[in-house]
A protein has these predicted regions:
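Short, hydrophobic/aromatic alpha-helical segments in well-folded domains
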Residues: 20-21, 122-123, 187, 204
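Hydrophobic alpha-helical segments embedded in or immediately adjacent to the lipid bilayer
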Residues: 131-164, 172-187, 226-230
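Alpha-helical membrane-spanning segments of integral membrane proteins, especially the hydrophobic core
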Residues: 82-95, 118-146, 166-175
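Membrane interface segments of multi-pass transport proteins and intramembrane proteases
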Residues: 156-167, 171, 235-246
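Short cytoplasmic-facing helical segments at TM-TM junctions of multi-pass membrane proteins
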Residues: 197-209
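Juxtamembrane transition segments at transmembrane-helix termini in multipass membrane proteins
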Residues: 2-20, 26, 36, 40-84, ...
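Loop-to-transmembrane-helix entry motif
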Residues: 24-32, 127-134, 138, 208-216
Length: 286
């Protein structure tokens, strides 16, 4: 089954799907993939903050030095750069394990919206079995986001570009990342629900964009709006350190992680229901 909708109809559908997903916030089983990802993000955060601990210093101290310079090794400087350090660590965690969380969530949401819920473990096993496909299918977009978010701004800064140029580059990178996110969210349904491989997934994307692209844009924008205020909290790290409570920055980054997971929950559920409604069987509940 495939249903064609114009742009306005897709916007209305996106709103309906986001509301339907919000009504699922209290279902613990749907949170399991994100809780696992959150634990991994938390471990990365604690390892960065506690890089000097004997258990991890052999690996983490050189890593912190490479990413933030030798000054970060002196207390409490690491907390000044902790949000930026964790953003880089989170990128790696998301690239390797976040794709499994997305895949599992897609499978769980699809079953829930079809009125045939499955255990969280089944969703995780299903996604883990397709880990390689999910990883490779998402990898080109992950690399583009890496270049836009970190590579270009750092290259301009190394060249001594003006503040205006840097801000414009960051703004352009933000817009580019949003466009990439629109394509990004379409991959998991093709892999997990349509059962496509990497090559077929990328072949199918151009034909999928006209069918659900407007809805995907709306969902990506809302998720970005939800996530944006929390990501701006990183700017307060210096102020927190200067006021003599550097360890509170760990809590600040933890808030960023939690909000990002909520945004990911909303995105995965909404795009899954959009896909079911326009491409696959929407199920009894919808």
């Amino acid at each position: 089954m495939s249903v064609r909708m114009n742009g306005f109809e897709q916007l209305a559908l996106a709103g309906h799907c986001m509301l339907a997903t919000l009504r699922q916030l209290g279902r613990g089983g749907l949170w399991v993939p994100w809780m696992v990802l959150g634990i991994l993000q938390g471990v990365a955060l604690l390892m960065l903050a506690g890089f000097a601990h004997p258990w991890v210093s052999v690996v983490m101290a050189p890593l912190v030095t490479w990413l933030a310079g030798a000054d970060a090794l002196h207390y409490p400087n690491v907390f000044r750069v902790l949000p930026a350090l964790h953003a880089r660590a989170a990128f790696v965690v998301d690239a390797l394990f976040g794709v499994v969380a997305i895949g599992a969530a897609t499978r769980l949401f699809a079953a829930r919206f079809a009125n045939q819920p499955i255990p969280a473990g089944d969703g995780l096993r299903s996604a883990a079995g397709r880990w390689w496909t999910l990883l490779i299918a998402h990898l080109p977009l992950q690399l583009l986001v890496l270049g836009l978010s970190f590579g270009i701004p750092e290259w301009l800064q190394a060249r001594g570009s003006s503040g205006v140029t840097l801000r414009l580059a960051i703004l352009a990178g933000f817009g580019g990342a949003l466009v990439i996110q629109v394509i990004f969210v379409m991959i998991a349904p093709l892999v997990m629900l349509a059962g496509l491989g990497v090559r077929d997934t990328w072949r199918e994307l151009p034909s999928l964009v006209p069918k659900i692209g407007v809805a995907a844009v709306a969902i990506a924008v809302v998720a970005t709006v939800v996530n944006f205020p929390a990501q701006m909290l990183g700017r307060f790290a210096d102020r927190i350190v200067d006021r003599g409570a550097p360890e509170l920055v760990i809590g600040l980054v933890a808030i960023q992680v939690a909000v990002a997971l909520v945004a990911a929950f909303l995105t995965a559920g909404s795009i899954t229901l959009v896909y079911q409604s326009l491409i696959g069987d929407p199920g009894d509940e919808w």
